[in-house]
Amino acid sequence: MAVAEAKPQYSHAEKKRFRKSFGKQTDIMPIPNLLEIQLKSYRDFLQTDTKLSEQLNTGLHAAFSSVFPIESFSGNARLEYVGYKLGEPAFDVRECKLRGLTYSAPLRVKIRLVVLDKDASDDPKPIKDIREQDVFMGEIPLMTDVGTFVVNGTERVVVSQLHRSPGVIFEHDKGKTHSSGKLLYSARIIPYRGSWLDFEFDPKDCVYVRIDRRRKLPVTILLRALGYEAEDILSEFFETTHCHLKNGEYHIDLIPQRLRGEIASFDIHVPETGELIVEQGRRITARHIKQMEKSQMQDLVVPRDYLIGKTLAKNIIDTSTGEFLAQANDEITEELLDAMANHGILQIDMIYTNDLDHGSYISDTLKIDPTGSQLEALVEIYRMMRPGEPPTKEAAEALFKNLFFVEERYDLSAVGRMKFNRRVGIKSDEGPGTLTKEDILSVIKTLIDIRNGIGMVDDIDHLGNRRVRSVGEMTENQFRVGLVRVERAVKERLSLVESENLMPQDLINAKPVSAAIKEFFGSSQLSQFMDQVNPLSGVTHKRRVSALGPGGLTRERAGFEVRDVHTTHYGRVCPIETPEGPNIGLINSLSVYARTNEYGFIETPCRKVVNGRVTDEVEYLSAIEEVDQYIAQSNVELDAQGNILADLVPCRHQNEFSLTTPDKINYMDVSPKQIVSVAASLIPFLEHDDANRALMGSNMQRQAVPTLRSEKPLVGTGMERIVASDSGVSVVAKRGGVIDLVDASRIVVRVNDDETTAGETGVDIYNLTKYFRSNQDTCINQRPIVSTGDRIQRGDVLADGPCTDMGELALGQNLLVAFMPWNGYNFEDSILISERIVHDDRFTTIHIEELTCIARDTKLGTEEITADIPNVGESALSNLDESGVVYIGAEVKAGDILVGKVTPKGETQLTPEEKLLRAIFGEKASDVKDSSLRVPSGMNGTVIDVQVFTRDGLEKDARAKSIEEEHLARVRKDLIDERRIREEDIYHRVSHLLLDKVATGGPGSLKPGSKITQDYLDKVEREKWFDIRIEDDAISQQLEQLSKQLELLTKEMEKRFNDSRKKIIQGDDLAPGVLKIVKVYLAVKRRIQPGDKMAGRHGNKGVISIVVPVEDMPHMEDGTAVDIVLNPLGVPSRMNIGQVLETHLGLAAKGLGRKIAQMLDEKQTPEAIKAYLEKIYNHDGVQRVNLKCLNDDELMTLADNLRAGVPMATPVFDGATEQEIKSMLQLADLPADGKTVLIDGRTGNKFDNPVTVGYMYMLKLNHLVDDKMHARSTGSYSLVTQQPLGGKAQFGGQRFGEMEVWALEAYGAAYTLQEMLTVKSDDVGGRTKIYKNIVDGDHRMDPGMPESFNVLLKEIRALGIDIELEHD
């Protein structure tokens, strides 16, 4: 029985090997789970752990709520949604991968059918009948613990999308539309779902509207359609100037500010004093306006000419007769003024406009508006949306209403409403999902304000205007699409409900829903085949945000601005990691600490600063919230109390970098690495690398192939452990306890008592993944790093996966590198390696190929998998068993048979001789042809696994049965171990209850009244302990309970075994016409060789040019030969100096390890070793290691693990300084300049100058020469041109193109050219002839007509021109 101890400071794996950190700052908050963006999004979509009453209106729940209730056309029946629940998945993740299934759970929705009494006259009609039922709505794919989906047996990732946020956006065309370069402003209302609404200015300053990017209409048509008259429109958009006719003079109500900038057309006097303020012809300035305000002028007498040309704000009507003298927006003319005077109209209302900041845009637009009423406006919009259809009043009204004002068709969403309200200045963040009249007006007003110079346009690339759409949201949208299709079908069937007694199940067909989901996960642009080369590539793939995809950008249309790094990317999106090539800047990676908020905007954490003092309180800020804050960097100097010491602090404010005083600072960055992504945070000395090279380094780490023996980097950044544990490739303890049993394929843990809840088993069994194929054919293999009896805590690493070493990410190998030229073999980034690397299998990788053989039911009969194959010798069948399937462990090469299969041939007419042979020998071989699965060309390896899938109902062959038996044995083994531990636990409690108690009787020599001793219990069989009778009734009852527990345990184990057995032995659901599938897995060992691509972590990539014998490599004075020689010219021009610093620090790390090894070999005391380790780990830096918490054994284990070198961590932007590297080199007794005298291995002479030598972490990338090299003799040809196909996959030839032909022509190599164009390419007759000739040993060729020439002739004839060749 395991009992928990206090939580230790370090994990089990960490204690075995500490990493010395050079970080100057302590991280204030732990790095959030790297896969949280995926896991949280899908968790919110499913809401499986939430009660129905507490479910939020998101995900599945929101999709159902938005479509239901569904009413019939007559309104007499409706379907209501009550709730849903997800069942258990039929197979676990591992089974789904093996069987090629989708890991999903059945979705059952509780639907209520309400039938109303249609004959009743009441309104609302009374309910006649209610029927409730659980309806199956298809399977919903489940997310695995590591954020992936298993679809048809392959792991996929749904990448998050960065798209334009719904809301309103104001922009201008940057002067590109019109030749004058005038800025044309526009506004666009983007809904989450529905039609786009654009408002735009044209070069003549009229305002237009477009719906869904169709033909533009004057904006006043839209306003009229909303019910506004010309007067209303003008009063909304313009200030009014009132003019009164008094005593034959025109007086205007004076607002002095409105005159500013105008040229006075008459003298302006102060009425009381007659003082002249402005002379005629002078421009009115701010000084003049001040004078007017000072003299408190209320009105201004203006000459009649001043009014001519002004625009009316209201209709002018003679009240006595009702006669219209002028319409609103008409210009005032001489005639109009006369008519008004004649009709006794004394007041004129004019709109106020000027050229500076009160443009007459809406007035001008009204002038070109052809419509005069709401109906005409609606008809005009109808004509634009539905050209060619005759409009009716009802159709026009319905169309316009459905565009923006109906929830089913239009939805701004919560985000869109929030963004909209904030942009147009509405105080609340909430509101309706559809548009209102006021919304449209406020957008037009804001647009006109911007045109008038008030306010700014928006920046589309600002992360406040782009939001992340994650898996959950995309799946919900897809689900809603499926439900809407269901709704249409259900509506039609609902009318039958009244006549027939139907249940909800009969009405709903779930096919459209499951088809929509299947389509999304199977073929959406954002549902991608998971990048599984190594753990880092998996993590990065899940943290990717893409601007491409449905509803996003396209590569061709994306300009430079969208791709560029934006100031708001700081701490949210990595400025370094993005692909090279056409997708640059469109696909990004989230920064280490970034997360998305409820609206989908990316947030980054900041420490709160109050009055110049930094607190430990952390707040997440989105790009919108960050704008007005002053945010300091994380490396600001602080005193012990957290006060900022500097007088001026560099900070970010209004998206700019500036210096400011400490009292203004509101926030401070959490960590220096918060601006970069996971991959970039793994590059040591990133701050010394050029950004372009850092980009390549980030991308190439993702292509590193897992080596046979992973080796941790000597120089890391401290992120390695986090990436390895979050990636899900290593096995992490779910609960603490003691290791009970370990072997290569599983770990059994006896869980601590206080970590088990009632009804839970106190045993955790971890089955390890052994030699499993990844999506990229690399090998996924886990190996335990714990031993029996070890005490572990929750979260400890129990087993290393691919590319992990003691729970740390380990993508490559530490190699002794020298920067020097070597006989031209490292020209142009080539790399020279030592034979020792090959010999020690440092970069040997295992690749697993999956080969599949399918037996089908054909027209001529069934294909059969068998070892009885016609015309094949015994030796070719030596690796097959009696079922015709290859043995596990067989070493095979190209052309070997893996699975024997025969296919029936068509019946052919037999010759008399064949008939005789068949009669004598019963020969049936001619009926079938050999269609066995063979090893493809260029491949050889070892068979490591075979899977046989048989169609349900067919008899299984011997091999399939033996595979099943193995599987059952594994299940049985797990159950036996679990049962053993749980039984021991129960018997331990029984013995605890019985010891020293007085017995009244029992088996064996137990006399009544005697005490029960341990000796007695040891002699009696454990099963009979329950027969001992005891005086104490309470204890007797407890014993009885424990006895029942044992019985229940036995039953539970039997049930679990039977369930597993049923699953294992059931037939497989194969595609139609498929009888049997055999999958063979080959492990291919690839050693490193010339042509393979290698790289460091700083973008320093190259191809191996030669493998040099160890004795020829340059070596140091102590005889140590270097492993790899790089060209020093690869450093200065590339500006990635990080690799040089890494080399120096790597040398120090290795030297320190050597000194520790020396101390261990000299058998020095633990105290002496501890003192030396203290010097290494704790003589500087903030992030110290507490060695006091280790006992002597742990200390010696640690020291032993440090023999190969002391791992160092130099966090990005907070790494080791030059001085610190030098002090480490001195501590290891190495030269402080990191240079060493090298001796040429071939001559034995010293090189002229000392050379930079040290340890660099090198990766082998997934660009292997074995996969790329290819040669062809004869093969398949293109159908039309008869030329050989191209590419390795088609077993194609090399293209001899136009330029190559010129080269041969230039050399006059006529015969070579002739054979290139004829017998080696598309001269069909000639190539068969030469093949025969070569076989016969005759090397002559007889060229004929190339087939492509015949194609050309046929094309010319198709044009009606007849060409015939004349033969001499």
Swiss-Prot record:
Keywords assigned by UniProt, alphabetized: DNA-directed RNA polymerase, Nucleotidyltransferase, Transcription, Transferase
Reactions that this protein is recorded to catalyse: RNA(n) + a ribonucleoside 5'-triphosphate = RNA(n+1) + diphosphate
PROSITE patterns: RNA_POL_BETA (PS01166)
SUPFAM superfamilies referenced in this protein's UniProt entry, alphabetically: beta and beta-prime subunits of DNA dependent RNA-polymerase
One Pfam family in the UniProt entry: RNA_pol_Rpb2_6
Any one cellular-component term (Gene Ontology): DNA-directed RNA polymerase complex
EC number in record: 2.7.7.6
Record-linked InterPro entries: DNA-dir_RNA_pol_bsu_ext_1_sf (IPR042107), DNA-dir_RNA_pol_bsu_external_1 (IPR019462), DNA-dir_RNA_pol_su2 (IPR015712), DNA-dir_RNAP_su2_dom (IPR007120), DNA-dir_RNAP_su2_hyb_sf (IPR037033), RNA_pol_bsu_bac (IPR010243), RNA_pol_bsu_CS (IPR007121), RNA_pol_bsu_protrusion (IPR007644)
One GO BP: DNA-templated transcription
Single GO MF descriptor: ribonucleoside binding
Protein's job: DNA-dependent RNA polymerase catalyzes the transcription of DNA into RNA using the four ribonucleoside triphosphates as substrates.
Subunit structure: The RNAP catalytic core consists of 2 alpha, 1 beta, 1 beta' and 1 omega subunit. When a sigma factor is associated with the core the holoenzyme is formed, which can initiate transcription.
The family this protein is said to belong to: Belongs to the RNA polymerase beta chain family.
Protein name: DNA-directed RNA polymerase subunit beta
